[in-house]
Amino acid sequence: MSKGRIYEFDPILYPRLLWIVKGSGEFVREHFRKKGGEELTEDDVDMRYVDAWVCKCERKSDNRLGIVFFFDTGLEAKQLVHECYHALTAFVSEINADLPDYDSDGMEEFAAYLIEWIFDCCWKVKQGKVK
């Protein structure tokens, strides 16, 4: 069994968890599979060419659904924000919603709050402020 750590966050209002994973791709594959039951492949979690990875997954231990956010702790803030957007779109697609336009009379606020929450979770893990 490979070494790693899973940080779990529950957005409460949304029916999916956010798992931020530190460790190897092998560690991710030991604990998660793709949503729908398909196993993650080595290519899915290959970090040689990317600094972060986001995927809709199931936790193998209990089949809970969520978003896995796997990143190198050396990730810069601008890259982290980029990946947070991918996590946001994964959450939004899981509730069968669309991202609203800016000119939608404030209807985009839910997405702004959700991406803020995702970034805050990631930033706390990156800064070592989560136990």
What is each residue range found by the language model?
Residues 67-68, 73-78, 87-128:
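Post-HEXXH active-site segment of zinc metalloproteases
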Residues 1-3, 127-131:
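Short intrinsically disordered terminal tails
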Residues 1-35:
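Charge-rich, low-complexity N-terminal segments
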Residues 83:
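Walker B catalytic acidic pair
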